Amino acid sequence: MPSEHGTALVTGGGRGIGAGIARELAADGWSVVVAARSPDEIDSVAEEIDGRAIELDVSDREAVERAVAVVGDIELLVANAGVAGPDGATWEIDPADWWHVQEINVLGVHLCCRTVIPGMLERSSGRIVITASGAAYLPGSSSTAYPTSKAAVARYGETLANELRGRIPVFFFSPGLVKTAMTGHWGDDLPWTPPELAPRLVLVLASGRADALAGRYIHAEHDDIEDLIVRADEIVANDLNAIRLQR
């Protein structure tokens, strides 16, 4: 597969936001590997974009390590795989179901990142983009599992960006309220985010033009990424778009 930019690994790439990101990257000249647990879906997306498909459970350390070894040099990791988890009263949810959300949404991000980072450091090249969520900052009232996982992911992304600053840019972003198979049952009257915004944002983050914003929280709908790039020095100097307590 000819590639202008290198290889991008997109987890959770068989549907929804991940599939949109895979399509956007492929259209821009990336060689895209689509990874997820659903073989039919990833095969379909991979065929559509002339990419590759790898069946992958991101919470399985050995499976992640095998997948990264098979793919080879990864220039861009989009750690997007996630599940919404069980709704209902926290005290009534099976702890195994609650913990499963953390395994996919948090451990899965960590395993993918820790596995690709050594190669990126060795090549002095690469970027990481993590799909977070506004649920990290705006807790709902129907489940503790999902917002807990996304709060952890946001802090993980910010901290990892600090660890790798000056070496590997790490971004985390909220795609907004996108209507997907995971969220579509919530109803039609919600303020749904246009599905094309997240893929467009990831494309900019992958380009290198936004590297000064590594470790800053970015919202695909509420933030204008081009404006943020222009204001990057101000944002860093004043510690804006950061996770913090308000007092």
Residue ranges and their predicted role:
Residues 118, 162-163:
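Alpha-helical segment proximal to the catalytic Tyr-Lys
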Residues 91-110, 125, 129, 153:
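Catalytic Tyr-X3-Lys loop
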Residues 84-99, 142-145:
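Conserved mid-core segment of classical short-chain dehydrogenase/reductases
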Residues 172-173, 188-247:
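C-terminal helical subdomain
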Residues 113, 149:
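Active-site helix of classical SDR
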Residues 55-66, 95:
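The beta1-alpha1 cofactor-binding region of Rossmann-like NAD(H)/NADP(H)-dependent oxidoreductases
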Residues 133:
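Residue(s) in the substrate-gating loop at a strand-loop-helix junction
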Residues 14-16:
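Conserved glycine-rich cofactor-binding loop
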